Amino acid sequence: MDLSLTYRALQSGELDIIAGNSTDGLISALDLFQLEDDRRYFPPYQAVFIARSDKMSVLSGAFGRLSNAISTEEMRRLNYEVDGNKRTPREVAGEWVKSR
């Protein structure tokens, strides 16, 4: 099932619990909450940069500035701007970069 559909099914009461992504904007958009995985069942999710090796010299500086720059909560808020407020990813990311 599409992850966005599972969030909507959870919100509507069709499901009681789902496995999702901690940075999904739909958590905020649909006023849901994240349970703590105190038994560490799910492995940690780490976002990584992926690029072609011939572009690394151009991108390494930008990647360095972005590394560890966004918390889970902030990423969720940014995703909410796209998922909940229907803004474009380019607009949201552009504002975030300018705010740094």
Positions of predicted regions on the chain:
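Ligand-binding clefts/hinges and TM-proximal coupling segments of bilobed small-molecule sensing domains
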Residues: 58-100
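Ligand-binding "clamshell"
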Residues: 10-17, 26-39, 44
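A bilobed periplasmic-binding-protein/Venus flytrap-type ligand-binding module shared by bacterial periplasmic
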Residues: 44-57
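Short helix-initiation/N-cap motifs at beta->coil->alpha
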Residues: 1-8
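Short, low-complexity, polar/charged sequence segments that are solvent-exposed and flexible
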Residues: 36-40, 53-55, 67-70
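Short secondary-structure boundary segments
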Residues: 21-23, 53
